[in-house]
Amino acid sequence: MKKHDLIPFFTVLLSLVLGIVVIALLGKNPFLAYYNLLQGSGLAPKASYAGHKGMITDFTSFLNALTPMLLASLSVLIALKAGLFNIGVSGQMLAAAFVATVLVGYSELPAVLAKPLVILIGLAVGALVGGLVGYLRHRFNINEVVSTIMCNYIVQFVASFFINVLFVDPVSRQSKNIGAASRLTLVDTVVGDYKMDIPLGILVAAAAVAATVFLLGKTTLGFEIKAVGSSSRAAEYAGIRVGRTRVLAMMLSGGAAGLAGVTYYLGYFCSMQPRVLASTGYDAIAVALLGNSSPIGIIFSSFLITVISKGSTYMSSTAGVQAEMASALTGIILLISACGAYVRERLDRWKENR
């Protein structure tokens, strides 16, 4: 491990220390607040509350939130490795989930067929949308930031139109709930005194991380993606087909985003809200950067950001620290991680000039 690979760990540590200082200045107990974050995420014991709810319930809810965040971060990471910036993860998530919901979610297929179909459709639709962005970059030199933002709007309003016209629930004004057989859950039942809702998507996410590690570290395509991301001109001189590699990278990125979409809308939730894009796709950009653009690194960064997000409500009610403090803490972490990226770049330049 290189020395500057430890920079993300130090930036997170420094951010948590700054969080302690800020919470202390507010007159609250920072250590209790951090412990409450863990309790709210189901990572530390606490008393049961309400009906069938307690630590186990909170932990399975945490897994449901972690899964799409991890997959969305993988999507951003793959694009970054190719020197591309996929800001359209939220749109790709919605496109994949909408198609999967219409084709499978409202059907009467048995779970043994419905769940694999949902995953495959999510992967395929996400890859198609991502591949379109890559093709526009290759064929017409349209910057992927512009095209992904436009795709976000197109997907958002097309999906909203069909939801409002054909699939709206008259009470909730969201899309109709999908069938239980199509939900990406392994276990959804009450065991003893606790409700268990374990996501199938966590296995999908683990497989996706392993596949990404293998792709980037052991395959020719992975080498080509990293070469194009480092220097497209040098890669072209080396005989690598830059356009083809970018299209494939965006297809892989979109596929991961599609998986994030189906695990979010057909796992974490059971419906889609018209004209609303999931913030997960945007948060994933910061998570991927915080994870040092490494498949293993984003496991830890996704874990950290999800803990802060899921535990904030319990922290607010127990420690008296406003839930907005969790968002501020996330912002501090990302700001200092950006400074860490600058330090890493300066270290690399210093070594080159020695």
Where are these regions (language model features)?
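Hydrophobic core segments of alpha-helical transmembrane domains in multi-pass membrane transport
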Residues: P8-A24, M69-V76, A97-L103, L123-L128, ...
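Transmembrane helix-bundle core of multi-pass membrane transporters
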Residues: G40, T148, N152-K218, M325, ...
